[in-house]
């Protein structure tokens, strides 16, 4: 049995915690919400209040870093925060992890680090600050990768969807919507399973894309969502070829033996 601490018991982190508990692991985690604290604790997750602002603020969070595996799930904030804020958050996470001699870290990154160059890309793509789609996220990855005293695996998730996150709803009734580019989505269930798989199989010091292997067009996903769930589709779509795109390969994680429960975004289930 491993002890696993999840920094960020949110939309992905909380279901991952339940999944790991069911597998017999000791699970700890953090939330930024005092309202969620008691509910999480009552269900068996040792939970601390912790917010990186960008320095750590909270109560009782030091014990989170006394763990076998640290799962870092801090999404970048909106563009309203100063440039470099996210990198500073990750620096403080690393500092706490190193102080506590954490041996294994999983960092939740994003496929937004890849540029939209109208091509298929995999983990070997040579990212630089000049070509990346997100300098902030790439910088965060590099902070954790540099001068490290721990095993580190990075998961670059695509669009985290399913359950209450319905892609077509975000574009319902909108005009001039991009429809002809491939989607790079992953269902919540598979994002949880993939994260757990990396821990179970000891897949350390790697970078993996977390994206369903099939890539239907955006228009097809939005239209199917509207038909099945009963809301309006987009009013109109942009002309084909206007938007740049990328198609993210999931071959590397598939080669480890991982199997997606929902390999096609057209088959995602939702609970609106």
Which residues does each predicted region cover?
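C-terminal amphipathic/interface module of NAD(P)-dependent oxidoreductases
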Residues: 46, 50-54, 233, 240-272
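Conserved Rossmann-fold NAD(P)-dependent oxidoreductase catalytic core, especially the SDR/UDP-sugar
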Residues: 92-130
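NAD(P)-cofactor binding segment of oxidoreductase domains
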Residues: 62-106
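Conserved beta-loop-beta element that borders a ligand/cofactor-binding pocket
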Residues: 139-163
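Substrate-positioning beta->alpha
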Residues: 154-157, 166-167, 176-199
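Conserved N-terminal Rossmann-fold NAD(P)-binding element of oxidoreductases
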Residues: 4-8
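Mid/C-terminal beta-alpha module of Rossmann-like enzyme folds, strongest
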Residues: 192-249
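N-terminal Rossmann-fold NAD(P) dinucleotide-binding loop
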Residues: 13-14
């Amino acid at each position: 049995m491993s002890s696993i601490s999840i920094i960020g018991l949110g939309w992905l982190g909380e279901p991952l915690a339940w999944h790991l508990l069911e597998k017999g692991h000791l699970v700890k985690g953090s939330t930024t919400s005092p309202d969620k604290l008691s509910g999480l604790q009552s269900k068996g997750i040792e939970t601390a209040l912790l917010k990186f602002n960008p320095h750590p603020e909270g109560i009782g969070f030091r014990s989170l870093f006394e763990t076998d595996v640290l799962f870092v799930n801090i999404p970048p904030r909106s563009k309203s925060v100063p440039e470099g804020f996210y990198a500073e958050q990750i620096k403080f996470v690393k500092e706490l992890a190193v102080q506590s001699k954490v041996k294994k870290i999983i960092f939740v990154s994003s496929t937004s680090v890849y540029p939209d160059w109208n091509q298929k890309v995999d983990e070997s793509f040579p990212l630089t600050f000049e070509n990346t789609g997100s300098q902030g996220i790439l910088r965060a990855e590099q902070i954790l990768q540099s001068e490290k005293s721990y095993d580190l695996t990075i998961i670059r998730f695509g669009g985290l969807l399913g359950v209450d996150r319905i892609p077509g709803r975000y574009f319902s009734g909108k005009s001039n919507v991009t429809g002809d580019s491939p989607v790079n989505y992953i269902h919540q269930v598979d994002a949880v399973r993939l994260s757990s798989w990396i821990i179970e199989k000891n897949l350390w010091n790697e970078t993996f894309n977390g994206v369903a292997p099939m890539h239907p067009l955006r228009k097809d996903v939005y239209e199917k969502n509207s038909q099945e769930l009963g809301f309006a589709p987009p009013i109109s779509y942009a002309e084909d070829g206007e938007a740049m795109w990328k198609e993210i390969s999931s071959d590397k994680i598939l080669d480890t033996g991982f199997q997606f429960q929902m390999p096609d975004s057209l088959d995602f289930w939702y609970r609106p």
